[in-house]
């Protein structure tokens, strides 16, 4: 697990470097895979490893992959809320559908697992988890304002630091679905 943690933090930092300094269109893949692996290495030491049960990991990955397809159909194709201006079909499929959505959800899941270890009261979770979801979404979206792997079309409610406010609320919905999945797949102990 130590190697996974080192590799994870290196990939995470590479993702940040690619976004902030190179303005690379593939920064997000490194960022989310690295963030997931790094937090997985921390959480596994605390007795909560998603990797420990391969069937659970693959089920979560597939569920997040399907969720990403549904989000893309509704938000991108039907509502035209965002697009990926520099991606052809192959890169879109690889970096958005296969890597992006599953790993950002796994990264978010690891983040929420880590937080629940510090806040033992389930009452505190009702305050901490929504705030954490918005902060997690903000970090993902703000970093993208330097690289623009995806771009938003004008949306209602305005923007905050280049991020549509409605998108921050959608992150809240996306990441708060994860605790339900955590109960279903037995990640809470």
What are the residue ranges of the model-derived segments?
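Aromatic-rich, lipid-facing transmembrane alpha helices and their immediate juxtamembrane interface loops
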Residues: 1-189
